[in-house]
């Protein structure tokens, strides 16, 4: 494990105005990244953002830092994170930068990088950037300063790319879909993709104002989507998170379909078509029901650490093409290089159309075991998981489950949260046991 000062599991993230998400730091980050990336030849960086109000400030700071290092910035405006990975590849840019805090509230923001291949930066490159950050900022000669430009057709390019992952012999004609874009980066992309493929689209969360991103909408809160699907008598609902790398769905009965179920549907369809090479990667948080359902299909399944970068690492290690987190990060390496909510959703839609089945029936081969996740916020630098009382509470729960469930306690990689997950056969028992551990974590925090 590398010991980064600034880079977390998903780039650099925090509250805007607090270190490190300040204009002066982000300017220097742009300069430091520019110094490292300039060693590799190309002088162009693609920069995209989600819809947070702070994105304007931070992209200006990045531009100044990159220019001082002699690199040019090409801006896309609000675009999904996976779109920047795609555009970085197609423009042969040295790197892509996304200004986003994904599913976090609007007052947070972050910076994450993509390599020339459209994948997250290797640890050694992040370490090299951190080493440059420790040095005093310098500026290249005026004749070598970087320039700024805008990619005017970025959205159109990405829309066509997404549509190209949907089978050319199929159409969404006759399907009514409610789409919730979380007032985030997919708001002007996802509805167009679905309409151009033939669907009737009802939109939610497509009016960003800079401060309503992820606010009681999108993949992290599907209650509004569930009620709208029922009210519209729609065939299904699709929700993305603020930066578009996650997808959660809702069937025609208003029931939530999470990342585990989406992974199951896609894997089963790949298997049916003879296109599943190897197995499937989930995480420690993946529901036991997914593992059991894949076992019935004869599909190998392994778990990685939580975090889409670790899912990808495990996929690359095994040589497999499909992986996902239950939160809705779905990685399909035969389609793209990173988690992409729009593209993952399209693969589920193609399974629906190709099998003449609704989403509810497609998911029926997998039974989710009751799983309760409780997030406990903590303050300070101490680790509540090191507490003897927390360990005792966890051991007590393990004993009560008696081998017929799972307990997982972990720190969030992006927020000051302890995630308490308990899984078992009985919903009431699982909820009670999860809150028993959560109470111990709160007391320790």
Curated annotation (Swiss-Prot):
Q: Coiled-coil ranges per the record?
A: none
List required co-factors.
Mg(2+)
- Describe the processing and modification events after translation: Activated by phosphorylation.
List residues modified as Phosphoserine. Answer: 102
GO terms for MF:
magnesium ion binding; phosphoglucosamine mutase activity; phosphomannomutase activity
Q: Tell me the cofactor note.
A: Binds 1 Mg(2+) ion per subunit.
Pfam family membership, one: PGM_PMM_II
Q: CDD domains, per this entry?
A: GlmM
Q: What Enzyme Commission number(s) does the record list for this chain?
A: 5.4.2.10
Q: Which reaction does it catalyse?
A: alpha-D-glucosamine 1-phosphate = D-glucosamine 6-phosphate
Which keywords, in A-to-Z order, does the entry hold? Isomerase, Magnesium, Metal-binding, Phosphoprotein
Q: Which Gene3D superfamilies does UniProt cross-reference here?
A: Alpha-D-Glucose-1,6-Bisphosphate, subunit A, domain 3 (3.40.120.10), Alpha-D-phosphohexomutase, C-terminal domain (3.30.310.50)
* GO cellular component, as recorded: cytosol
- A biological process (GO) annotation for this entry? carbohydrate metabolic process
Q: Does the keyword Phosphoprotein apply?
A: yes
Residues in the active site?
102
Q: Does the keyword Isomerase apply?
A: yes
Q: Where does Mg(2+) bind?
A: 102, 241, 243, 245
Similarity annotation: Belongs to the phosphohexose mutase family.
Q: What is this protein's record name?
A: Phosphoglucosamine mutase
């Amino acid at each position: 494990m590398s010991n980064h000062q600034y880079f977390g599991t998903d780039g650099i993230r925090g509250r805007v105005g607090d270190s490190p998400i300040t204009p002066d730091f982000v300017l220097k980050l742009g300069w430091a990244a520019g110094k490292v990336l300039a060693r590799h030849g190309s002088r162009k960086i693609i920069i995209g953002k989600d819809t947070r109000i702070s994105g304007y400030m931070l992209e200006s700071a990045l531009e100044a830092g990159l220019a001082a290092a002699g690199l040019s910035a090409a801006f896309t405006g609000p675009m999904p994170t996976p779109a920047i990975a795609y555009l970085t590849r197609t423009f042969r840019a040295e790197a892509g930068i996304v200004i986003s805090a994904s599913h976090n509230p609007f007052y947070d923001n972050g910076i994450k990088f993509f390599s020339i291949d459209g994948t997250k930066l290797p640890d050694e490159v992040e370490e090299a950037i951190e080493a440059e950050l420790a040095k005093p900022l310098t500026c290249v000669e005026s004749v070598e300063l970087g320039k700024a430009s805008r990619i005017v057709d970025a959205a159109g390019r990405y829309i066509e790319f997404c549509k190209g992952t949907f089978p050319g012999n199929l159409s969404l004609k006759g399907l009514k879909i409610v789409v919730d874009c979380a007032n985030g980066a997919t708001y002007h992309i996802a509805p167009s993709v679905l309409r151009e493929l033939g669907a009737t689209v009802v939109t939610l969360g497509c009016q960003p104002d800079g401060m309503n991103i992820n606010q009681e909408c999108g993949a992290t809160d599907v209650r509004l989507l569930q009620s709208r699907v029922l009210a519209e008598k729609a065939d299904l609902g699709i929700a993305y998170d603020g930066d578009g790398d996650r997808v959660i769905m809702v069937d025609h009965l208003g029931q939530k379909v999470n990342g585990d179920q989406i992974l199951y549907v896609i894997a089963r369809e790949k298997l049916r078509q003879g296109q599943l090479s190897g197995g499937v990667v989930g995480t420690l948080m993946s529901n036991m029901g997914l593992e059991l359902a894949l076992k019935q299909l004869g599909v190998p399944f392994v778990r990685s650490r939580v975090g889409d970068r670790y899912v990808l690492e495990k996929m690359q290690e095994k040589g497999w093409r499909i992986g996902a987190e239950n939160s809705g990060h779905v990685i399909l390496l035969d389609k793209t290089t990173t988690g992409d909510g729009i593209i993952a959703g399209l693969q589920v839609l193609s399974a629906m159309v190709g099998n003449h089945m609704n989403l509810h029936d497609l998911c029926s081969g997998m039974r989710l075991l009751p799983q309760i996740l409780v997030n406990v916020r903590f303050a300070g630098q101490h680790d509540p998981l090191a507490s003897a009382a927390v360990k005792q509470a966890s051991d007590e729960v393990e004993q009560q489950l008696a081998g017929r469930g799972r307990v997982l306690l972990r720190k969030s990689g992006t927020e000051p949260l302890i995630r308490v997950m308990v899984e078992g056969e009985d919903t009431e028992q699982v909820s009670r046991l999860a809150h028993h551990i959560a109470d111990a974590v709160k007391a320790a925090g």
